[in-house]
């Protein structure tokens, strides 16, 4: 869900009165006002409640989420319907409530509770400015931010209690959220603020009488509400899910590994949110989900907190218990709800926030519950008796000590009329008595947790600057405290605070770039492809031979020390040893080998979704061109690209393959995968030209990305700054970046389809028993399949990483454009139709209207014309051969359906955004190029034959020449 921006953040919209007036619209009982936020497919507006039939305005605010239904595919529409259905059934103080819903033919207007303070992510980022705003000024005065880290622990515990209260309610209904993150945790000023500031009439419109009354926590602090249930679903306790949903930085490892998961995945997200509130950064940060999972695995459950941070032992223990990689070792829901941080009183509260029972002089707790002192609106004085959540005798305790609410009992008859009771409850089946309040009284004597010098975090690799001092420090266990004198404590605390502050400033920029912007579905596809490639690799004959040779090799001790040289006398390693080393070069994902779940093609993956989104701009006519700028497409340095790199066993059938027929389904399938890989390679080469204009690399890194020994080089992900763009204007960078991005996405679409074909074949044939003769043929096919799938997997991951880099470049360049430029972010609107929205992760807008098909079509025309001219003049015929084949491959890629479907589509259906007329035009051009290409190859064969004849007819005394060109289609 797109969340409203906080009041102390600069607004990107509604800058002028005219634009505000244009935004006003009557939607049922509400008037839509100014624009406050934007999502991938929705705009969020602030609305006000109006009296029916009178148009008299009230000052109570609501949030109106206006979803453009025309931009949603079936999957997203299902998510929207699911979100509305879930919100209708959920009524809890710490869950954003649905107030109303209005549907039009083109838009769905969802009226929800308005959260004035925005989301928790902005709250943490702008924590230094909270003291300057009326809604949070008193909070910061009472609980100032620490010098190192994020929010005061009192505030963190307050939010943790409220988050636990909402989760306990969700678990009682068997719901799992699946996308808990700071951006989906919205905040409202406390009711105490509205009461004391005399602005009760400005309180947001409440869905029911208790939605603005906190169920737990501190009454004077902001109120937290969980939002965005687009990925939520009903998941019974014994069920497991396997859909990759959520935001990578806050995803549980089992989801990143594409394993089945249960509701415990939400607990991991809770741990990441608590860590970020305490430390002002997520516990794990990475550019993509593969790197993120690697960092989580490498940490091995050792959660390290920044030095100098003020964090109690109980809070650290809770976060560490939540951030366990294995769900079986992770804290359970019952343990979480009964944890001291959630169940017990919040320590170090100021006197005015203490429950009234704690301030009473009598040692015994009062019999009657304390009554609220502030006055609430009249419509909130009466609470419906059929509230979906209930109260219990535990409501009589103070708010700071109240545990979260579970499904509840009926209101007590002793409840005072007109006084909204606390929405707190006892746990089901719990017979434990309520602890006397006086047992918590000693906690008030200690105003701040003592910061000791004990090493509370697991051991980590220290920088070189710290290793020199390591010998003088004693490491203590988590349960011990270092006996440091008080004077040394102060010095050490100052040193840690200063060092932590420097690190805080250095990490802030990295955090902004690494913070997740939304839902990244492409990560799911990468996990699926990695899992399939690993599974096929395990089942290939080569890998099985490696295992046998490894067992044989382990029976004897290897004495090989190195390569044979004249000086060392080392013997060359045996063939068996060489074989067993090969898998380590390309297949290191041991965790994926253990899974044998069927591969499921995902047609709604990011590859397909991104391509469909970008191809919303019509390609009809094909005569339109992007703005012509110096140095942009097509670059003069672009030449034809070689075919998909095959092994020595000739993975591809190069040349005229019309005469090649086969009745073997396996061979046909592998041939289809190889053809798709070849098409993707051609488009990838085109994208690489654009990429290297924006991110130059050393000459040694060019080519096929293959290093010494056949090891594939990892694409550079560090070059994301603007140092290499100094010679390009922002306008030029925007154009090149958009062209590169759409070409990479087109490449991903073809790679995606090739993996779908491989997955369908693998699921169908992997379990069958074969005769010895058939098994021998299958082994050869499996070898080819393993090689091509491994290549596709590596290329898919590389394109994902590079497309992320280009996306960042594009967003940076758009920010650097003049403010009056049409492509500047403040002049763009996803709903206006003037720009194309790409994906749902970063709200990338393509302003030039370019598509991959348009670029490929223009380039194919240019290359075929160049080849035709050279053919007529007889100049450089091998180069003409490459140009013709590359142009034909580009046109074939345009016509290739990106989805692997068992049913044949109608001729009138659009495929990849192309209408029938456009496809027919491209098909005619392709046939003409193929015809000329066939004629050219005949000319080349004639030249070769003439050259051979001239060699054989040469005098015997002259040496023969063997300088003929290499085989067809070879790149020069």
Swiss-Prot record:
Disulfide linkage: none
Residue span, Protein kinase domain: 30-342
Transmembrane segments: none
Low complexity bias: start-end ranges: 9-20, 398-413, 559-574
Source taxon at top rank: Eukaryota
Pfam annotation, one family: ATG1-like_MIT1
Membrane-topology annotation of the record: Peripheral membrane protein
Binding site for ATP: 36-44, 65
One CC-aspect GO term: autophagosome
Single Gene Ontology BP annotation: response to starvation
Residue ranges, annotated region (Disordered): 1-20, 358-510, 538-602, 706-725, 812-835, 938-972
GO molecular function terms attached to this record: ATP binding; protein serine kinase activity; protein serine/threonine kinase activity
Gene3D superfamilies xrefs: Phosphorylase Kinase, domain 1, Transferase(Phosphotransferase) domain 1
Reaction catalysed by this enzyme: L-seryl-[protein] + ATP = O-phospho-L-seryl-[protein] + ADP + H(+); L-threonyl-[protein] + ATP = O-phospho-L-threonyl-[protein] + ADP + H(+)
Keywords of this entry: ATP-binding, Autophagy, Cytoplasm, Kinase, Membrane, Nucleotide-binding, Protein transport, Serine/threonine-protein kinase, Transferase, Transport
Biased composition annotated in UniProt, kind: Basic and acidic residues: 437-448, 489-498, 544-555
Composition-biased stretches (Polar residues): 577-589, 961-972
Purpose of the protein: Serine/threonine protein kinase involved in the cytoplasm to vacuole transport (Cvt) and found to be essential in autophagy, where it is required for the formation of autophagosomes. Involved in the clearance of protein aggregates which cannot be efficiently cleared by the proteasome. Required for selective autophagic degradation of the nucleus (nucleophagy) as well as for mitophagy which contributes to regulate mitochondrial quantity and quality by eliminating the mitochondria to a basal level to fulfill cellular energy requirements and preventing excess ROS production.
Name recorded for this polypeptide: Serine/threonine-protein kinase atg1
Source organism: Phaeosphaeria nodorum (strain SN15 / ATCC MYA-4574 / FGSC 10173) (Glume blotch fungus)
